[in-house]
């Protein structure tokens, strides 16, 4: 299993941002190999973290090539005050499988 973690500092979100965000989420959920996602927000720092879980790197690469994702990436400076992406391979998972995930298998 792999994760793609998108950590960002928010600016103002407009209708275009929300439409792209919904389109990216729908595209991710339609990709074979998508396992789920979770979102965390730190109110003290203002940072948000979206974690997507994937069966394979190939599934993640499909999302990276999605037109909505490419549009959001090109326009990120309008909505974000900086971001960082972390791609990781999960070696082990313990506890309640799927706890905290939306759209868990």
Question: Where are each of the predicted segments found?
Answer:
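Short S/T/G/P-rich N-terminal loop/turn motif that feeds into the first structured element of a domain
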Residues: 1-48, 57-65, 78-105
């Amino acid at each position: 299993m792999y994760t793609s973690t998108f950590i960002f500092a928010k600016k103002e979100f407009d209708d275009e941002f929300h439409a792209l965000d919904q389109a990216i989420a729908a595209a991710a959920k339609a990709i074979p190999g998508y396992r789920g996602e979770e979102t965390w927000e730190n109110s003290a720092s203002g940072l948000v973290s979206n974690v997507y879980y994937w069966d394979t790197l190939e599934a993640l690469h499909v999302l990276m090539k999605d037109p909505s994702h490419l549009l959001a990436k090109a326009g990120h400076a309008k909505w974000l005050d900086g971001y960082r992406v972390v791609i990781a391979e999960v070696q082990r998972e313990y506890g309640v499988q799927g706890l905290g995930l939306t759209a868990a298998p």
